[in-house]
Curated annotation (Swiss-Prot):
This is Serine--tRNA ligase. GO terms for cellular component: cytoplasm. The gene is serS. Belongs to the class-II aminoacyl-tRNA synthetase family. Type-1 seryl-tRNA synthetase subfamily. L-serine binds at residues 240-242, 294, 393. It comes from Cupriavidus metallidurans (strain ATCC 43123 / DSM 2839 / NBRC 102507 / CH34).
Amino acid sequence: MLDIQLLRKDIDAVAQRLATRGFQLDVALFQALEAERKQLQTQTEDLQARRNSLSKQIGMLKGKGEDASGPMAEVAGIGDTLKASAQRLAEIQDQISDAMLSIPNLPHESVPTGKDETENVEVRRVGTPRTFDFEIKDHVDVGARLGLDFETATKVTGSRFAFLRGGVARMHRALVQLMVDTHTLEHGYTEMYVPYIVNAASMRGTGQLPKFEDDLFKVPRKVGGEDGQDAIENFYLIPTAEVPLTNVVRDAIVAAEKLPLRFVAHTPCFRSEAGSYGKDTRGMIRQHQFDKVEMVQVVPSEQSMDALEQMTGHAETILKKLELPFRTVVLCTGDMGFGSTKTYDIEVWIPAQNTYREISSCSSMGDFQARRMQARMRAGQGKPELVHTLNGSGLAVGRTLVAILENYQNADGSVTVPKALQPYMGGITRLEPEA
């Protein structure tokens, strides 16, 4: 959530910056709400002050044994007016808060201006795509003989799910181990095991609610109501471990000397992909359920941009170890996620598509999430300040498996196991087709 003072001081400047990311701020609505809020706040405070003054006057008159009926009548009249004014003020403040929750983050000054993904800027390219001397197969055809099974998953659940069996299941697990070991042993992250179901407050804290509710899997649950009747409370399957990991610091004040915090977790992720109908319908690129190793950092504001560069490098390390060609791009203003102030996407080479596809997204959220969560830090006896939060995929496990199946495929249908994975797979050097 943006600092409302930015809008109060120079709403036109904020609107211009938001327009670069394709968001049209309703300036007139905000100004109308603000004008009414100011008027109601002044009116409410004046009524409260008048009531307090009259109450003192009544006390003094009664203490002297004098008639206080006049001031008492005025207090009685003020009560109803004050109640109505305070109630309307609360309604307006709620409307402003709801409006603020729908406004995306401001792009960092270093982010290139652009309308969509075609205007993202490549910052580096690592590795050279392999030249094949046989016809390239995509991961669906390669995996079909190795234990990658979409047909059974469709029968058991539906489309956009997968069964992994035997060698590919083992490789999937090995990838998780490599990623988590690298981030904990080499990059200084603390491994976390987190809930896969979170409450609405957590989703609001990281920015998934209210804007992206249609993309989430909702889990309604009966809870005891205050009147003894069951009420329904909505919980949600996590779309990314960013949600539980970042919410660790919700409503908390962290001692400055404990920062930065670095967390990493391997979890399944669940997304309805409501806006992705018809995209990547074949294979594992876009699934309703997929595994991801997620990195989260909580840092002081002045370390935010350096931490983003560092985290992006941490994600790139995995691809370097696996010797997979990739490129890193900085997203332009029009392609950034809702809560991000700056994002790098890392894209891995997919031979069958003859292109690079996203395998990691690393973002600084600035204080956008922290303001929603009231996540703060305190140096010594100083005033609490909002922290900055960052998150990044390190990596998407299924897409990494896809990249290996395609980049390491052999003419006989086998797949060479990358050297970095072999210790995690008992020394196996190849996945051989099933008999």
